[in-house]
A protein has these predicted regions:
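Catalytic NTP-binding/metal-coordinating core of nucleotidyl cyclase/transferase enzymes
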Residues: 1-59
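Cytosolic nucleotide-binding catalytic cores of signal-transduction proteins
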Residues: 18, 36-40, 60-68, 86, ...
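Catalytic core regions of nucleotide second-messenger enzymes
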Residues: 26-27, 31-34, 65-89, 151-154, ...
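A short glycine-enriched loop-to-beta-strand structural element that forms part of the catalytic core
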Residues: 41, 81-98
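A short beta-strand-to-alpha-helix junction
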Residues: 54, 64, 110-114
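Alpha-helical scaffolding flanking metal-ion-dependent phosphate/phosphodiester catalytic sites
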Residues: 57, 90-93, 114-117, 121
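Cytosolic regulatory/linker segments at or just downstream of nucleotide-handling modules
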Residues: 95, 118, 124-174
Length: 174
């Protein structure tokens, strides 16, 4: 069943409200919303340290995936046939953060190779998958359960990159 304009607006706003709320709850900065995509970053304007920022980011992604499953069930119950899926790419690294643009239009955003790698990982991810880079994995491996996906060829990078698929948080023993 195709959605009319008002239904599509409600559908998209419900999704974006849910996901952006999760991003903010975990301390992320919402960079931009492009259609049904949300770009979120951690570490600016406030960083809790590189490792804590990485753990918060991956934890946010896990929470988003769980919330998306609930939204998908709700939409399916409402009779929506084409239910979107979720894919995410996460990388940790240096980038340039600031206001970019012209005197007519400025965006507070981030640029650089690290940002490009996160985008490429998102493109390489399967439906419902969160792919993280080796640099992120090294920071979160004691808190997050992951599977090594091996080397992935990514556009714009001369060598393949090692990627990990996020499973879930590691359960802490009391």
């Amino acid at each position: 069943e195709q959605l009319n304009g008002d239904e599509l607006t409600e559908f998209l706003n419900t999704y974006l409200t849910e996901m952006s709320g999760i991003a903010v709850r975990f301390g992320g900065t919402i960079d931009k919303i492009m259609g049904d995509s949300i770009m979120v970053f951690f570490g600016d304007p406030v960083s809790r340290g590189v490792q804590n920022d990485a753990i918060s980011c991956v934890s946010m992604a896990i929470a988003m995936r769980k919330a998306m499953k609930k939204l998908q069930q709700r939409w399916q119950s409402a009779g929506i046939k084409e239910i979107p899926s979720l894919r995410m790419g996460i990388n940790t690294g240096l980038c340039k953060v600031g206001n970019f643009g012209t005197e007519h239009h400025l965006n507070y955003t981030l640029l650089g190779r690290s940002v490009n790698l996160a985008s490429r990982l998102e493109s390489a991810a399967c439906d419902e998958e969160i792919l993280i880079s080796l640099s992120t994995y090294e920071l979160v491996k004691h808190s997050i359960d992951c599977t090594n996906r091996g080397e992935i060829a990514v556009k714009g990078f001369s060598k393949p990159v090692i990627a990990y698929s996020v499973i879930d948080m590691i359960k802490q023993e009391n």
